[in-house]
């Protein structure tokens, strides 16, 4: 019995040891870095898309410029994914920012410097240590040339856009690593991205200050009353004058128009061109449209309208006088108050 128990005990221990070894073998592959299906290398700063496929962050960024879809399942990539990516290991980003050596490589961005990812930084350091003048880098599906003499980088097929690079110590202030910001609490969102896949700033940041464009104020030409220039934009001290004063000004200006109409052409006594115009009274309610006609019509037309209206007033007064001479049924005379309208818009009351 004891022997059987010992045998049974040894037999029970074998599967346990075997299971432990299997567990160790299963946990080892989980620590390996996944491979990227775009660059066909181990992922650098791996990110997980909503479809659960894993790629390098810069590879996803480069693919998003072309189709904004997953490279494997073609599911659409959200618009804000590049601004708020889902990192598999955020601690790796912080470790990469601290670096392994004394010097690392940076490229220029807006208002700061970005650190290259670890793989690209090793390639640049290797070329620099060997004394090469330039080297090529594959970043997000685009070939870049790093000019180590002039310390600039540019796309191999686009030499116009150049970006400064530098080799510096690890502890200098920087914005992030390979387009991934170190300050995760930043609320800055890139609204319009350019076609840049090297992890640089590719959009204009949204600022809280709003720029207001100056609105041009509508200006009106200067007008004159009795030869004095007045500005309709600036209120005059006599803005509160009564309608009678305004009508008096209109009458004076109307008479001056009539006087000038009798002069020949070129006989203006060096008067200013604007002295013959009447102030714009569109804001005041007049009882007739004759004043507005005088304001805009030429001198000849104004003279003709003045003469015609004077004839109408005189004929109306004559008709009223004839009617007043007729006897009334009561034996008295008829007293009529006639309200006439002068050409300048002023109303007068004539008692007959």
Curated annotation (Swiss-Prot):
GO cellular component term, pick one: nucleus
Subunit structure: Can form homooligomers. Interacts with PARsylated AXIN1, AXIN2, BLZF1, CASC3, H1-2, IPO7, LIG3, NCL, PARP1, XRCC1, XRCC5 and XRCC6. Interacts with DDB1, DHX15, IQGAP1, LRPPRC, PARP2, PRKDC, RUVBL2, TNKS1 and TNKS2. Binding often leads to interactor ubiquitination, in the presence of the appropriate E1 and E2 enzymes, and proteasomal degradation.
Entry note about domains: The WWE domain mediates non-covalent poly(ADP-ribose)-binding.
Top enzyme class: transferase
Name of encoding gene: Rnf146
GO molecular function terms noted in the UniProt entry: enzyme binding; poly-ADP-D-ribose binding; ubiquitin protein ligase activity; ubiquitin-protein transferase activity; zinc ion binding
Pfam families tied to this protein: WWE, zf-C3HC4_3
Keywords from the UniProt entry: Cytoplasm, Isopeptide bond, Metal-binding, Nucleus, Phosphoprotein, Transferase, Ubl conjugation, Ubl conjugation pathway, Wnt signaling pathway, Zinc, Zinc-finger
Domain of life: Eukaryota
InterPro entries reported for this sequence: RING-HC_RNF146 (IPR044110), RNF146 (IPR033509), WWE-dom_subgr (IPR018123), WWE_dom (IPR004170), WWE_dom_sf (IPR037197), Znf_RING (IPR001841), Znf_RING/FYVE/PHD (IPR013083), Znf_RING_CS (IPR017907)
Protein name in UniProt: E3 ubiquitin-protein ligase RNF146
The species this protein was found in: Rattus norvegicus
Cross-link (Glycyl lysine isopeptide (Lys-Gly) (interchain with G-Cter in ubiquitin)): 84, 94, 130, 175
Biased composition regions of type Polar residues, renumbered to the chain: 215-233
Compositionally biased spans, kind Low complexity: 197-210
